């Protein structure tokens, strides 16, 4: 399922989407590649005050429509706990799995929910980037709270 909301602040336009449920990790980038988007840069960021979870930031462009966008992705488990994006490095991914099995660390969430914040044509304005970051923070908090208060299937 997919739920999308559109927010506007002056000339800035942002789409907030919640996609669910996915079994394990869903690579949302594949959906955008299929729509002609290209990724210029990707950064995984640990939000302040959080341990072990990451937010993925993507600089994107769509040459056919001459569009530029910033997208932030955040993944949650069914209980609303933010998750960490898997490593992009194949060797690190394999070693993390082996070490995780050896140490019997917590496994990846079985079911995940993906939050997307897509800011189209944000430009280089710090105000626009701050507005998108604020929208992301509020959306993450709201989704986490909603999921944590939802009845869990037994």
Regions found by a protein language model. Give the residues of each.
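Surface-exposed amphipathic alpha-helical segments
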Residues: 110-154
């Amino acid at each position: 399922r997919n739920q999308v909301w559109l927010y506007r602040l002056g000339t800035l336009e942002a789409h907030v989407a919640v996609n669910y449920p996915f079994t394990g990790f869903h690579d949302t980038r594949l959906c955008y590649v299929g729509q002609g988007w290209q990724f210029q840069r990707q950064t995984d960021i640990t939000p302040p005050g959080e341990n072990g979870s990451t937010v993925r930031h993507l600089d994107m462009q769509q040459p056919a429509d001459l569009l530029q966008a910033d997208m932030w992705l955040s993944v949650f488990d069914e209980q609303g706990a933010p998750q960490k994006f898997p490593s992009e490095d194949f060797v690190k991914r394999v070693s993390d799995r082996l070490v995780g099995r050896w140490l019997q660390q917590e496994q990846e969430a079985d079911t995940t929910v993906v939050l997307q914040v897509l800011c189209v044509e944000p430009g280089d304005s710090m105000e626009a980037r701050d507005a998108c970051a604020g929208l992301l923070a509020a959306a993450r908090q709201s989704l986490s709270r909603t999921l944590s208060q939802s009845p869990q299937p037994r």
